[in-house]
Amino acid sequence: MHCCRFLLNLTLFGLLGFAGIGSAKANTVNAILEGELLVITGDNLANAITLTTNSAGDVLVVGRNGTLVNGAPSVRFRRPVLNSVEILMFGGNDNVLINGLTVNNDLFLNLGDGNDTLRSGLVPSSIGANLSVEGASGNEIVRLAGWTIGGDCTVDGQTGTLNCELTGLNVGFAITAIGDEARDVVTLAGCTMGGFSSIETRGANDSVTVTDFIGLGLSVNTDAGLDSVALTRVATLEDIYVNTGVHRDTVNFTDVNSDRNITVSLDGGDDSFGGVNVSAQYDAVFEGGAGIDTFLDGGIIGGTKTDVKEFEIFP
């Protein structure tokens, strides 16, 4: 009787194991250095990795929260010269931290499906050419601070909900942040760039905040939804353009200057615009659009003209 019970338990254990029940599959990331190209690929589980450079100049890919790298807790590349880095995380709720990395050319990162996070460490990274970050479906969180990027910086949340915060970036050309039909949040703080930057969040109730920004030009387009746009201490050599689309939107400018033109278009809905110490070298144009719109003038000057139209309330 005991023998039969033992055989039955053994058979059940084998069947459960074969079905994947009672056994744990390790989160696996592969890291391969092909000449001067570092390629990191995840699986469809929740992976957490840190990509960092130590004091000797070695590049380490370290697994966290049970993630294995090449089957081990971490992998070390001895003093590599990285021309390009490609990171493909695929599905799962992934977490990527990049600390003190130097890439001579491009860094491309696709977070894949899932609720993903990309963060920078205490030591800023340097990208010689372009930084491209892509999300997919899910909640995509991007937090980068202090990086130097020689070319363009592009963050595209794809179909997910984008929560992007870029702080103290020095970008050679442009910053581009793109959301989709979700409640996106984009924050740029203390960024300097040489190109014309743009933020596009499309539908849903979005929030865009730009503070201490110096660049060639800036375009913000939030499209439909109850959107909020705030620009504070923003200076550009070229145009500043904001379009919030239909529904009830709020736009506030404080200490905003363009050496060319400023255009704000609020479109349909009961919108409001407030400006304090706002100036354009040439034209400053503000369009309220359909609805009962509010215009608060705390010092707005267009060198050639100041054109305020389709606003109904002037408190």
What function would you assign to each model-found segment?
Residues 9-19:
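Bacterial N-terminal signal peptides
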Residues 24-315:
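Acidic, glycine-rich low-complexity segments
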